C-alpha cells in the first residue's frame, strides 16, 4: 500500500467516498505498475468527483482546473481518444503513445487529482482562517 501522505490525506478526507479511498491509497502500489486499465478507472472516478466541484476548483485556480480537465478529456480517460473512427475525439498523439508514456501521464494526472482535492480543502480552510483572523484583528 502506498505511503504517500498526500494520497492518505485526500483518501481519508470527507471529499472522497469510502469505496474510492482504498483505490486512491493503492494507486502507486507496485502491483499496479503497468495496469493502465485499473489506473484509468481510478482516475475516472476522481474525475467524476472533481466534475461536481469544477466551478469551485476554477475559482481557486482556473488554469490548473483547465489543465486537469484537459487531461481527463484527451488522454483516453473520459473519452475514447484512440479510435480514429470517433470523430472529434481521436488524438493521434495519444493513439501512438507507448504504454509506458501513457502510464506516466496517468500517474501525473493522478497526482494532479490529489493536488486538486488538497487545494479545494485549503479553500475551505482559508474561509475559516479569514473568520478567525477577523475575530483576532477586531479585538
Task: State each model region's role.
Residues 1-21:
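Helix-loop junctions and short alpha-helical segments
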Residues 5, 20, 27-28, 91:
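A generic structural signal for ordered alpha-helices
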Residues 9-16, 35-38, 98, 102:
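Generic alpha-helical structural element
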Residues 21-45, 50-55:
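A mid-sequence, solvent-exposed acidic-amphipathic segment
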Residues 44, 55-139:
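Alpha-helical oligomerization segments
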Amino acid at each position: 500500500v502506498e505511503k504517500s501522505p498526500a494520497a492518505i490525506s485526500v483518501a481519508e478526507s470527507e471529499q472522497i467516498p469510502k469505496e474510492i479511498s482504498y483505490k486512491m491509497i493503492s494507486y502507486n502500489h507496485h502491483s499496479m505498475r503497468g495496469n493502465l486499465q485499473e489506473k484509468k478507472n481510478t482516475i475516472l472516478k476522481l474525475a467524476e468527483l472533481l466534475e461536481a466541484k469544477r466551478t469551485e476548483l476554477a475559482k481557486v485556480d482556473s488554469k490548473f482546473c483547465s489543465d486537469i480537465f484537459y487531461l481527463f478529456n484527451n488522454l483516453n480517460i473520459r473519452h475514447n481518444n484512440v479510435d480514429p473512427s470517433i470523430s472529434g475525439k481521436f488524438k493521434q498523439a495519444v493513439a501512438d503513445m507507448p504504454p509506458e508514456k501513457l502510464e506516466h501521464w496517468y500517474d501525473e494526472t493522478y497526482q494532479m487529482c490529489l493536488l486538486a482535492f488538497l487545494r479545494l480543502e485549503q479553500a475551505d480552510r482559508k474561509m475559516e482562517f479569514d473568520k478567525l483572523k477577523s475575530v483576532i484583528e477586531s479585538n
